[in-house]
A protein has these predicted regions:
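Charged, often Cys/His-bearing segments associated with DNA-binding zinc-finger transcription factors
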Residues: 1-40, 313-322
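Basic, short loop/linker segments at the boundary and entry of helix-turn-helix/winged-helix-like folds
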Residues: 20-64, 68
Length: 322
């Protein structure tokens, strides 16, 4: 694939660098994180030759911007036209055209088709682990509900598969009906960095997902009562992981006073992960998914996890410098 990038910056490039608007978060991310391996993997999926295309590295960074600031494809195109800090972050040269919304959309489809979105969070976390930001001692696991991007169908249509979003489903929480998806996350207990993230239909039982998102290299895993199943207890024992899951009562087993006290202690640790969901929903606009289907919404969640970790890294480094 041919690209538009020139090796030598123009005079105007240098002028823009000197007067460009300051965005400390983006500058810290650009300085501290190496995107080269991710860029190489994406670029390798393109055919060699043909007409010039927007560079994969530019589009990858556009994806990150979108999920840092909750931007749609048209909004991303518009903001890139106007904000020098965004142009600088995506490494867009002054002679390069800003990618339009169609190009951004096609790049997203390419990531899904090639399965590369599954590697993006792992590539970032490898760097964070190497620098000691992800500590594998304590892992927190939890899930949150995210609304569907489509209007709720009636229950009969949903059961018969006639809903506009076939992968969304109904569930109940706090005695209220909810239609959409469920985002499952595991995080590092020390710095609250996301280690793994998976999307499921809203009716998916939390306990069935723990083994898929909880890293097996953890020393102890804290999770809600929904994960207190025999299968999860066996999985923890098989991997030599201490059980920090809150105990739940069964119809034939009552919790002792000691169990209740232990649950309270575990809950104090586990609830730290709720800050991640609060950030995703408030600052990264994740109260509602943007797309239809599990595949596209898994990509969205993965990119939001990448963006969250990048912003969290910038915050940690800023606190250390203070």
């Amino acid at each position: 694939m041919q690209t538009k990038r020139e090796n030598q910056p123009t005079f105007f490039d240098l002028a823009v660098q000197q007067r460009g608007s300051v965005n400390r978060v983006l500058e810290t991310i650009a300085r501290e994180v190496d995107f080269s391996e991710a860029e190489t993997r994406v670029t390798a999926t393109y055919r060699q030759g043909g007409r010039p295309a927007c560079r994969a590295g530019v589009l990858l960074r556009v994806m990150i911007l979108q999920h840092l600031y909750g931007l749609s494809d048209p909004q991303a195109e518009e903001q890139l036209q106007d904000r020098l800090s965004f142009q600088k972050f995506v490494q867009l040269d002054t002679h390069e055209a800003v990618p339009d919304e169609t190009t951004i959309c096609r790049f997203r489809q390419r990531l899904i088709a090639c399965g590369l979105h599954e590697a993006l969070l792992g590539l970032l976390n490898t760097q964070l682990e190497a620098r000691g930001f992800i500590v594998k001692r304590v892992t927190l696991v939890d899930a949150t509900l995210v609304e569907s991007s489509r209007k709720r169908p009636d229950a009969q249509a949903a059961r018969e598969g006639r809903a506009p979003d076939a992968d969304a489903s109904y569930t109940r929480k706090y005695n209220q009906s909810f239609y959409g998806y469920k985002a499952h996350v595991s995080s590092d207990g020390e710095h609250q960095l996301i280690r793994a993230a998976a999307i499921s239909t809203a009716s998916q039982y939390d306990g069935e997902v723990l083994a898929h998102i909880a890293p097996a290299d953890s020393e102890v895993i804290y999770a809600d009562k929904a994960c207190d199943t025999k299968a999860n207890q066996a999985w923890l024992r098989a991997h030599g992981i201490r059980n920090g899951i809150l105990k739940k009562e069964a119809h034939h087993i009552r919790l002792t006073a000691a169990d209740v006290a232990q649950n309270q202690k575990k809950s104090l640790v586990r609830r730290q992960i709720e800050r991640i969901f609060a950030h995703l929903k408030k600052w990264q606009h994740y109260r509602r998914v943007r797309y239809l289907g599990l595949a596209k919404n898994q990509l969205e969640l993965t990119l939001k996890a990448v963006a969250y970790n990048l912003k969290r890294l910038a915050g940690i480094l800023e606190m250390r410098r203070a």
